[in-house]
Amino acid sequence: MKAVCPGSFDPITLGHLDIITRAAAQFEEVTVLVTANPNKNSGLFTVEERMDLIRRSTAHLSNVKVDTWATLLVDYTTAHGIGALVKGLRSSLDYEYELPMAQMNRRLSGVDTFFLLTDEKYGYVSSTLCKEVARYGGDVSGLLPEVVVDAVKQKYTQQ
């Protein structure tokens, strides 16, 4: 079965990478799908930059590919014959947020959502928090893939 790991990934964190790696061990093919979230600002990285950082961070996973999509997620899964969505859950708050979307996606297309519990060492990690720490010169190594740490530092030194 093919699966999608959707998200804005601005930027990809080690928590995201852990979920993607675990999904890749369970599914024959995993597409990391960079989506535009209308509830979030335009972002630190462009969609193309995010896709490049994800490709570089997942290069060791032969069954992972990266794509982007700007409309309904279920339209992507239907168009590409994908039967599963994979989402990471850090806490019950994530579950409360993700459950109605999972139910709507199932209603619209029959796609199932698989929830993977985040490794406890990444339970507090979010792209937003990492950007906030990095913006003020804090150390985000151990929270982001190394290639992403370098890219984030470069972005903030340019501003």
From Swiss-Prot:
GO terms for cellular component: cytoplasm. Substrate binds at residues 8, 40, 73, 87. It is found in: Cytoplasm. GO terms for molecular function: ATP binding; pantetheine-phosphate adenylyltransferase activity. Pathway: Cofactor biosynthesis; coenzyme A biosynthesis; CoA from (R)-pantothenate: step 4/5. Pfam families: CTP_transf_like. The record marks 16 as: Transition state stabilizer. Signal peptide: none annotated. Its EC number is 2.7.7.3. Its cofactor is Mg(2+). One of its GO terms (biological process) is coenzyme A biosynthetic process. It is an enzyme of class 2 (transferase). ATP binds at residues 8-9, 16, 88-90, 98, 122-128. Keywords: ATP-binding, Coenzyme A biosynthesis, Cytoplasm, Magnesium, Nucleotide-binding, Nucleotidyltransferase, Transferase. It catalyses: (R)-4'-phosphopantetheine + ATP + H(+) = 3'-dephospho-CoA + diphosphate. Reversibly transfers an adenylyl group from ATP to 4'-phosphopantetheine, yielding dephospho-CoA (dPCoA) and pyrophosphate. Homohexamer. NCBIfam families: coaD_prev_kdtB, cyt_tran_rel. Belongs to the bacterial CoaD family. This is Phosphopantetheine adenylyltransferase.
